[in-house]
């Protein structure tokens, strides 16, 4: 004998109920129904969803069952087998900015599912550092313009960006949307060679470190890095000589320190070191030395080639050693992070940096070397927070004909001779009461 089971999908606009005939005493076997943007939560005996129906129940008479639905969230999460973390994939996400949380229900989100956000209309994507695995094609077929990820690739061996857009190898750069302009890589590990191979449409790139890579190595060739205008390296122990060579469009640069490492002096402590000594299209030659004597004797200087359009440099940490920015004629701005451990600005550090507009001496600086801003073009200088500076050395601002405004440190004791020699644009200056000595020709 047969009995009829009527399956009512139980929502406005639903298709007509379907009837399933089964043998009396059998259990219901039917695939779970689906509904866009909703998750099926089981069958109930009433349309009011008061009594759940157990699908293992033997059915001996005609019966009508009613579906229960729950609206899907924008993001869906799946608990890992060990119960310690979650993976994430799309629910009803409608496009636009996608922000993946670092935690869900008190546990870390560690994985983005393969194809988990494929073709969902995402334009800006943020993946937190808690994520250690991004599945293949996780963000495929989206016109993403800005992307923040903890690693380049899946974090599990496929160490190239195109993987998370569905590519099998780094050679398939076309998988990466050409709308992508800004890429931020989190974590603290340097990326692998060819991780961005062939992706020549980026113009804003932030990396956690470079290690022994050059930017050209990262992109699989120098031809792919000529469009990057904003570049940041946030950490790491070192940057190789010439690591940034070929970045001809560069306008803004953030570095973890000046030169090869945080503590290097000599050639390795010069800003131009990371751009190298070989010319490239869009570069200009600078001569940087380690003293004022080197400045007036270019044959004693080191030669570097720096992007012609580079205007702004942000230094995250470390001292500025002798001659560091000597003859950097295009720079208009050099700034330091608020938490930078900068205590020293060396001799001739900005000598000949003729385009400088304003400069704020970091609060932790206690010593500024002779000739530090001599022949520079700096117009305004703020030393008011650097209250450990007690001496303005000779020629610190000498021959600077553009300097118009300066705030001196409140604990200043000595202004040495020639400190402001030929600073003809400086009309007014407030000298702290703490000053006891002013050298000859100081002004």
Where are these regions (language model features)?
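Solvent-exposed loop and capping/linker segments of extracellular ligand-binding repeat ectodomains
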Residues: 1-14, 19-37, 47, 51-443
């Amino acid at each position: 004998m047969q009995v009829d089971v009527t399956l009512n999908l139980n929502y406005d606009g639903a298709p007509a109920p379907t009837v399933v005939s089964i043998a009396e005493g059998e259990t219901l076997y039917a695939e779970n129904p689906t509904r866009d943007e909703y998750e099926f939560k089981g069958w109930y005996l009433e349309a009011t969803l008061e009594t759940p129906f157990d699908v293992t129940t033997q059915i001996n008479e005609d019966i009508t069952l009613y579906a229960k639905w729950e609206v899907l969230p924008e993001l869906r999460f799946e608990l890992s087998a060990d119960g310690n973390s979650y993976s994430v994939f799309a629910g009803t996400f409608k496009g636009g900015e996608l922000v993946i949380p670092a935690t869900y229900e008190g546990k870390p989100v560690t994985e983005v599912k393969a194809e988990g956000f494929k073709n969902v209309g995402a334009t800006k994507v943020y993946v937190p550092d808690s994520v250690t695995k991004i599945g293949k094609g996780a963000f495929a077929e989206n016109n993403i313009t800005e992307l923040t990820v903890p690693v380049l690739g899946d974090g599990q061996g496929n160490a190239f960006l195109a993987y998370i857009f569905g590519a099998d190898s780094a050679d398939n750069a076309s998988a990466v949307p050409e709308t992508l302009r800004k890429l931020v890589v989190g974590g603290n590990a340097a990326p692998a060679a060819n991780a961005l191979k062939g992706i020549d449409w980026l113009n804003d790139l932030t990396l956690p470190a470079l290690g022994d890579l050059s930017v050209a190595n990262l992109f699989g060739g120098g031809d792919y890095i000529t469009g990057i205008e904003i570049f940041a390296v946030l950490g790491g122990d070192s940057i190789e000589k010439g690591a940034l060579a070929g970045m001809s469009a560069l306008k803004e640069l953030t570095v973890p320190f000046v030169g090869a490492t945080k503590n290097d002096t000599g050639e390795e402590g010069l800003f131009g070191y990371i751009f190298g000594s070989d010319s490239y299209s869009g570069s200009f030659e600078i001569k940087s030395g380690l003293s004022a004597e080197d400045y007036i004797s270019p044959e004693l200087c080191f030669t570097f080639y720096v992007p012609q359009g580079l205007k702004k440099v942000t230094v995250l940490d470390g001292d500025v050693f002798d001659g560091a920015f000597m003859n950097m004629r295009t720079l208009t701005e050099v700034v330091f992070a608020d938490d930078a451990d900068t205590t020293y600005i060396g001799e001739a550090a900005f000598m000949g940096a003729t385009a400088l507009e304003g400069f704020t001496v970091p609060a932790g600086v206690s010593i500024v070397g002779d000739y530090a801003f001599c022949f520079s073009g700096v117009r305004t200088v703020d030393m008011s927070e650097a209250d450990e500076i007690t001496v303005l050395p000779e020629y610190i601002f000498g021959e600077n004909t553009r300097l118009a405004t300066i705030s001196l440190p409140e604990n200043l004791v000595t202004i040495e001779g020639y400190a402001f020699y030929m600073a003809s644009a400086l009309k007014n200056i407030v000298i702290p009461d703490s000053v006891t000595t002013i050298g000859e020709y100081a002004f």
